[in-house]
């Protein structure tokens, strides 16, 4: 399981809820989690804020 999905599930957040929090579509977030699209830094910043992490933690582990 990838890091983003693991974080999301650990925090009991659905894919749709996460996409809404980040400000992107459900499909786009799903594609990022499944490595069909690249995770851009500006999205990593938003995701990191949700989980109270640093953006680099999203890319390199927490």
What is each of the regions a protein language model found here?
Residues 5, 30-31, 59:
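Key DNA-contacting residues within the recognition helix of helix-turn-helix
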Residues 43-57:
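DNA major-groove recognition helix of helix-turn-helix/homeodomain DNA-binding modules
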């Amino acid at each position: 399981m990838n890091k983003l999905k693991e974080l999301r599930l650990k925090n009991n957040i659905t894919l749709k809820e996460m996409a809404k929090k980040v400000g992107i579509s459900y499909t786009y977030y799903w594609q990022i989690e499944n490595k069909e699209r690249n995770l851009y830094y500006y999205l990593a910043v938003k995701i990191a804020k949700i989980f109270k992490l640093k953006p680099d933690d999203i890319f390199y582990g927490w």
